[in-house]
Amino acid sequence: MSNREQSLATPYLQFNRSQWAALRDSVPLTLTEEEIVKLKGINEDLSLDEVAEIYLPLSRLLNFYISSNLRRQAVLEQFLGTDGQKIPYIIGIAGSVAVGKSTTARVLQALLSRWPEHRSVELITTDGFLHPNKVLKERDLMKKKGFPQSYDMHSLVKFVSDIKSGTHKVTAPTYSHLTYDIVPNNNKVLEQPDILILEGLNVLQSGMDYPHDPHRVFVSDFVDFSIYVDAPETLLQTWYINRFLKFRQGAFSNPNSYFHNYAKLTEEEAVGIASQLWKEINGLNLKENILPTRERASLIMTKSANHAVECVRLRK
């Protein structure tokens, strides 16, 4: 099969790093190096070059899509003869644990909010819609946290449905990675943002991923543009272990940390436990529930070493 035939056989346009970077088209970099340092994750090297070459072209593309969506809404309002109702544009970001979804979400939030249109951009993670630990323990699901059955999907779907219905005030629960649990009485209130970035393992999942909990509507039904952050599993496991080691030296040393007992481990013991957690929980969840959703994404960013994006695939 020729390269042209291969290109026609896929629903994606593929760009290497330099091809994608060229699509920036003189969009100015509005983030300083100090601001970028604050946006990156605990185990990531996020450089000015990465933001300029990968995230600026992406923010330019998203700005085009969002503007097009607003024009479509205006056409519908003109047809119906109604006053404009503000309907947020939802960007979904999916991918494995440790791949850097949160950094991608934070960078896009910062860039999109600084476009000349000055749109309001909110960021919500689906972690807040995990069942509380009390419920997970009752259902013997603590070792399945992040798997489809560990989420309160009805609440998550209602949340995105309310957002897309133009509800003026919508609340979302928050999750603490320190206590490894939902934070009681600490809901985040969203008041009709222009853009909602929804980040989580499960934003691209659909009915086939929830046979235990049949319902007809899913988060992916409400997402306008979806991004899957991808990387080879060998890298993902390495990044997960390295992140675990950094947490052991930092967050785990906090007496309030759910994983405080891990702070006393030797490095060899910590690597062993992190490897086991990857094999039994995160790697398994990746293979069974996350990776199969990759080809549902509007755009796939594939990372190489040091979290540098080497390839971008954009749905035609």
Swiss-Prot record:
Matches recorded under Gene3D superfamilies: P-loop containing nucleotide triphosphate hydrolases (3.40.50.300)
Gene Ontology MF, one: pantothenate kinase activity
Subcellular location: Cytoplasm
Catalytic activity: (R)-pantothenate + ATP = (R)-4'-phosphopantothenate + ADP + H(+)
Keyword field: ATP-binding, Coenzyme A biosynthesis, Cytoplasm, Kinase, Nucleotide-binding, Transferase
GO BP field: coenzyme A biosynthetic process
Pathway assigned in UniProt: Cofactor biosynthesis; coenzyme A biosynthesis; CoA from (R)-pantothenate: step 1/5
GO cellular component, one term: cytoplasm
Principal place of residence: cytoplasm
Positions of ATP binding: G95, S96, V97, A98, V99, G100, K101, S102
Superkingdom in the source lineage: Bacteria
Pfam families linked: PRK
EC number: 2.7.1.33
Enzyme class: transferase
Family of the protein in this entry: Belongs to the prokaryotic pantothenate kinase family.
Family annotation (HAMAP family): Pantothen_kinase_1
Name this polypeptide is given: Pantothenate kinase
